[in-house]
Amino acid sequence: MNNTYPHPIIAREGWPYLGGIFIVTLIVHAAAGLGWAWPFWLLTVFVLQFFRDPARTVPTQANAILSPADGRIVAVEQVRDPYADRDALKISVFMNVFNVHSNRAPVDGTVQQVQYFPGKFVNADLDKASLENERNAVVLRRADGQVVTSVQVAGLIARRILCYTKVGETLARGQRYGFIRFGSRVDVYLPLTARPRVTIGEKVSATLTVLAELD
């Protein structure tokens, strides 16, 4: 996996959408003028902001668990991690359609498992979405042996999960490893000893926000 994603301002996942709507907009504008074309220009601007993908600076704290996504915290609770088969602290980030949708590694680690599960498409803001919706789990093991699980969860509108990593690869904190189109949720399962640094309702930014700290 390429560790040096070039951050071309607009996510590569959006290039086909942007190219298509831009061509249609130019055709309508040329044929009918701005009066007919302005809704298409607005749509073009929306697509631009939706697929924006700015570079992020990784915090220096070695024990920090970084947010894998932009969004809002909707859960901080002790649960069972069904992917790593353990009790864990779960922190969930809900992404709406206006958030950046790139997903980034929360820790440095080696990929132990990549598990895809088909499922429903209920509102990702609901707790039941974590285990009922379509999802993709990546289990990471840090050099110190601690395990962190990051789960991309599809939502009511988002029905396309993209994951670019595989078992055996090493991810660096903040490294881009996936994308979910049109808003959704990412669940992060941490060791029970992790100390949360966010609260429900708090807005977070991928890589920039520290979700928790490990011992």
Curated annotation (Swiss-Prot):
Its EC number is 4.1.1.65. It is found in: Cell membrane. GO terms for molecular function: phosphatidylserine decarboxylase activity. It comes from the Bacteria. GO terms for biological process: phosphatidylethanolamine biosynthetic process. Its cofactor is pyruvate. Keywords: Cell membrane, Decarboxylase, Lipid biosynthesis, Lipid metabolism, Lyase, Membrane, Phospholipid biosynthesis, Phospholipid metabolism, Pyruvate, Zymogen. It is a peripheral membrane protein. Is synthesized initially as an inactive proenzyme. Formation of the active enzyme involves a self-maturation process in which the active site pyruvoyl group is generated from an internal serine residue via an autocatalytic post-translational modification. Two non-identical subunits are generated from the proenzyme in this reaction, and the pyruvate is formed at the N-terminus of the alpha chain, which is derived from the carboxyl end of the proenzyme. It catalyses: a 1,2-diacyl-sn-glycero-3-phospho-L-serine + H(+) = a 1,2-diacyl-sn-glycero-3-phosphoethanolamine + CO2. The modification Pyruvic acid (Ser) is found at S184. It is an enzyme of class 4 (lyase). Pathway: Phospholipid metabolism; phosphatidylethanolamine biosynthesis; phosphatidylethanolamine from CDP-diacylglycerol: step 2/2. The keyword Transport does not apply. The active site is at S184 (schiff-base intermediate with substrate). The record marks G183, S184 as: Cleavage (non-hydrolytic). The keyword Lipid metabolism applies. InterPro entries: PS_Dcarbxylase (IPR003817), PSD-A (IPR033175). Its main location: membrane. Binds 1 pyruvoyl group covalently per subunit. Disulfide bonds: none annotated. Pfam families: PS_Dcarbxylase. Catalyzes the formation of phosphatidylethanolamine (PtdEtn) from phosphatidylserine (PtdSer). NCBIfam families: AS_decarb, PRK05305.1-2, PRK05305.1-5. Heterodimer of a large membrane-associated beta subunit and a small pyruvoyl-containing alpha subunit. This is Phosphatidylserine decarboxylase proenzyme. It comes from Ralstonia nicotianae (strain ATCC BAA-1114 / GMI1000) (Ralstonia solanacearum). The gene is psd.
